[in-house]
Amino acid sequence: LISAEVLFSSVGWILLLALIQILIAIFRKPLIKLYVFLITILELASLKKRLMAIPRMTAAMPASFGILCIAVFITGLCTSWHNKTAFHKLMSGKTIGEVEHTLTEKDHAVLYLPIYRLDFSIYANQLAAHQITQLIRAAHTVKVDSCSYRSPNIVLIIGESYGRHHSQQYGYFMETTPRQTALEKSRKLTKFTDVVTCWNLTSFVFKNMLSTHVIGEKGEWCDYPLFPEVFRKAGYNVTFITNEFLPQAKEAVYDFSGGFFLNNPELSKLQFDHRNTQLHDLDDGLLKDYDDSLKTFQKEHNLTIFHLMGQHVNYKLRYRKEQAKFWASSYEEKRPKLTTAQRKMLSHYDNATLYNDSIVAQIVKRFQKEDAVVIYVPDHGEECYEEDRGFICRNHSANIDWPLAHYEFEIPFWIYCSPKYIRNHRDIYRQIRKAKDKRFMT
């Protein structure tokens, strides 16, 4: 026999559940019939009450329903009026860049209905298609009469979200760029001291950096050829290795705006001979792409473009944890006004900058024995609790004051010349050294 102690223990509950399951299995059909009978009785009773209430409801319905509809309409209009005006502004943009900039505003439209999102997608693609047409037309105007190939190997590294005030090279109190600093001391790397970006939004920078259009000239960036097209026409083998702008599902409008002219099939063929095909969690994946396949396509004259993810938010995802050198406690003396959480965020950014230093140094290493020149430039700066401004990333305001210009537009920039390049092109090397303090915009 089973004792009472066993019945009221955990084992007893399991036995009870098993017994219930056995009874349900044995009496399943009678139980189903009983359930159906009870449900039918309840539904008939409910139906009778509803039928008796119909005359009263019908009499009051026209007026009540009309008032309710008006109230709902007025309430909906009042509560969503701001979003409707914001949606109208969004859909009034003349270029995809203008639309993107509108979306950076704090009070931008929220596309909460599927029909809104569909409408916006069609509109954005139409705007992009118009600029694609202009770019293709401009590309076919490119003519190169001759080329000296004085620089047989040109490497362009485009960084991401890198303010120069977090660079050891530019006087930052943390050792975030030890490898670049060492290259600078060797005089192979020339640091430029007064360089600003043309914008603090990646897509805007990419369009203006890759276009031969100069800000201030007539027309738009898409009215002029893209410089990789010019290099291809001149006979250079052009390789583009990006960790950000590849066509992918669920692409944000910012990535679409920055990459649509790179990923259009016709424009891609006009600009690049070779490209990578996948994105990576960390930028060392681009090095593997280059070493495993893209390096084999190098020819006598090459332009190789590396586009890094760099220090883009989320900062803690931009470096390997085992390579971390900075911690929240590292900033207690230098940044005493920051909270522990803010210091932790700052440590993530500086660790990402240190990791970026290692990636850039690895790229330089791959070309140091070639007759090569390597150019490094990030797309724009970045803020990470600078002074008492209290925020990270960027403020995409059209009103540019001094702090915003200082932290988000001032960027590091340098040119590395390999020993072989210096020997073969001393005149170019001297010109680079002479130009290091000149002002210019990317």
Q: At which residue positions do the language-model features occur?
A:
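Short beta-strand segments
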Residues: 240-242, 303-310, 350-353, 373-378, ...
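Short glycine/proline-rich turn/loop motifs
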Residues: 208, 269-272, 334-345, 426-434
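A short beta-strand-to-alpha-helix junction
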Residues: 218-225, 343-356, 398-411, 422-442
